[in-house]
Amino acid sequence: MIEPVVGYRMLQAIGWPWPGPPADSAWQAMCAMYSQCRPARVIEQHRSGYVVAEAPEVPIKVESLPAWQRRSFPPHERAVVGDWVLLDGRRIVALLPRRTVIKRLAAGEHYRQQLIAANLDTAFIVCGLDGDFNPRRIERYCVLIASGGVEPVVVLTKVDLCVDVAAAVAVLREHSSQALAVVAVDARKAEPVVALYPWLLPGRTVALLGSSGAGKSTLTNTLLGEQRMKVGEVRQRDSRGRHTTTHRALLPLPSGACLIDTPGMRELKFTGEEDLVEEFADIELLATQCRFRDCAHQAEPGCAVRAAIGCGTLDPQRLHHYFKLRGEIVGAADRSMLRRY
């Protein structure tokens, strides 16, 4: 691989994981195949093409692989914001293996994967402490994020509209099986920079996820230290806002981390049963202790899951939500199989 013109230090400033050439064997093999190419990171994705960077604040418009432009090409095999690619001039010639990824089923009835962002360390689930506060939706975000190998962190905004912030945090912890990090901030002030700094260290990449009107753009502006992102108004009747972020973009932060801002997501559909394993690890572990391997956790004798509910160590509502999400995944998979025949 040709040494980057700007040097690895500049690549590190946009999230390159190593101080020099790649240490990962899969990356090494790919770079050896394209030894005359140089690495860059996708910072914007548009219908017309991609914008990449080899250094902070130096965007380059590039052409994608011809195969990516075919409608029949699998969408999840195209580059997304956060991906690392290899360039030949101003043309993408290869996509480097992803370390982590956040994906969902595309909105609508079609069983099609949609990638949100790649090569992340953390995802901030931004939720306003107003009518937008929904612990079950936050739990869905956690499932979606953790299944891709990314750490979820809940960022509660609009604290001035909440009478009891501590109670809201307690509710979230009750709905999570893991030691979920929850941070409550006023996104308009400088405090988020301090409160969120442990996840914003140099070289790390963080994404902002959440519904429209949750305060993602306001938080982005605060972390950037400037009014770069447009902030929209929120309807009082349902606390929902218009999409002020219209496309995903990777932005370098003053802290040395990279931030990926995303449009609000109305639907959160999962791609497979493996999505549930991380967030519902407690139920999955209990299931291994059931008498029957095919236990449905309904009324079977020797069901460890039902026993946990009986002794109060498992919340019945949590099991109900697990069944609901699992049913969605199985139903989507069944519809996909029917379309193949």
Swiss-Prot record:
Boundaries of every CP-type G domain copy: 112-268
EC number, as in UniProt: 3.6.1.-
Intracellular or extracellular location(s): Cytoplasm
Family statement drawn from the similarity comment of this UniProt entry: Belongs to the TRAFAC class YlqF/YawG GTPase family. RsgA subfamily.
Keyword DNA-binding found: no
GO MF assignments: GTP binding; GTPase activity; metal ion binding; rRNA binding
Annotated keywords: Cytoplasm, GTP-binding, Hydrolase, Metal-binding, Nucleotide-binding, Ribosome biogenesis, RNA-binding, rRNA-binding, Zinc
Co-factor remark: Binds 1 zinc ion per subunit.
Protein name, entry field: Small ribosomal subunit biogenesis GTPase RsgA
Protein encoded by which gene: rsgA
GO biological process assignments: ribosomal small subunit biogenesis
Cofactor requirement: Zn(2+)
An annotated GO cellular component: cytoplasm
Functional note: One of several proteins that assist in the late maturation steps of the functional core of the 30S ribosomal subunit. Helps release RbfA from mature subunits. May play a role in the assembly of ribosomal proteins into the subunit. Circularly permuted GTPase that catalyzes slow GTP hydrolysis, GTPase activity is stimulated by the 30S ribosomal subunit.
Binding site for GTP: T157, K158, V159, D160, G210, S211, S212, G213, A214, G215, K216, S217, T218
List of residues binding Zn(2+): C290, C295, H297, C303
